[in-house]
């Protein structure tokens, strides 16, 4: 069976550094940090008092006020990113076979804020008996984002969410890619969403010592591959990519951002939260993705790394890149856009895949910000080009994006310039 080709024809973004793909990309290229003191809840008793929140977004510009109230914040973000992407791809939905358009979204945590609110209310009012919002469960469940998007557009194709912690939306893209190239769908609205900046989310990650506590200078806290890194920054938002079968896209005259050519998956099988210290899972997933894409290491010009600004994770990923790419590792560009967006958890893969697509399209590599020349970790090879502090113009023939999740879940997606 000949596999079909898959292209990216639409983008949507709700992020801490911009609420459209254009705004997000411009701020990434300019090295803008989305970190600031948390406004979504009172952090006075918390170790970490800052995060990368979505700012200046009017939900009601996109969603009916009454309907939006029935959704958790993460679902609102997913809906808005999908609305942008569907509009961007230029679909005339009237003649489309909606039975062959699906929705696959990645969600790592889901409606944790809704859960927090409902359980807190119950705990404070137990003597009055159980009283819950009738929308509690449909707001909270992780699959509802994909369901709501399909309901909005009437898409009857494959519809589900993927949940693999921080790799969730990369897995969603991988699944969407495979569904299309196997002929199971003409197009998939694929992406990820997360909104876990609440007392439960931040408190839980603080208890694990996973978050940076650089409260005096939040915008400088995420510093992947620097010796002084002290954990990641919680972030929220959503990213959406329209993946479409090539001939279907050409037939309707769609613009094409890039071609998706491969996806890899692997497991560390090592620890519930820590990366394998030698980067075993990271090595396997990049090898799998390159094999799936039919590409050699020297054909990759850019890696958007997982790069969360954690001690073990950054070291192990850098080791894995050297092992997989050999001499070619020193010729490509590496960057962590999490240094600007923070860690968007289940949405990270989609937003970082979008950054990779835009790097391929525009021949610009966004930077890894916050590195200082004298802040070098002896366990990291700085002959690798981490694109520190300033975007770099270069031809980007192809790029890959890594995401690694708690539980040892690893996913990698590959995009290249579209050639007819």
Question: Where do the PLM segments sit?
Answer:
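Conserved beta-ketoacyl condensing-enzyme motif
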Residues: 8, 23-24, 32-164, 193-202, ...
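Glycine-/small-residue-rich "gating" segment that lines the acyl/pantetheine channel
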Residues: 123-133, 174, 178, 194-251, ...
